[in-house]
Amino acid sequence: MRLFLSLPVLVVVLSMVLEGPAPAQGAPEVSNPFDGLEELGKTLEDNTQELINRITQSELPAKMWDWFSETFRKVKEKLKIDS
């Protein structure tokens, strides 16, 4: 009786194994997840480069340097007068 029940089960299991993986269970493509990551990196690089260009072309760094220089000069003069 056991052999009579185990043979059909063995045939079904063997047919499932030999059939191969279902399309949804196939091996995922390795390059697919990395394509999105590469695109994200490229976008981040472009945005960073654009930001650096805007900062270097703006007057903000020059104004900040002038303000720091002027403040430092005033502090030096104040310390000379007090000493």
UniProtKB/Swiss-Prot annotation:
InterPro entries registered for this protein in UniProt: ApoC-1_sf (IPR043081), ApoC-I (IPR006781)
Pfam families, alphabetized: ApoC-I
Designated name of the protein: Apolipoprotein C-I, acidic form
Transmembrane segments: none
Cleaved signal peptide residues: 1-26
UniProt subcellular location: Secreted
Molecular-function annotations in GO: fatty acid binding; phospholipase inhibitor activity
Single GO cellular component term: very-low-density lipoprotein particle
Keywords annotated in UniProt: Lipid transport, Secreted, Signal, Transport
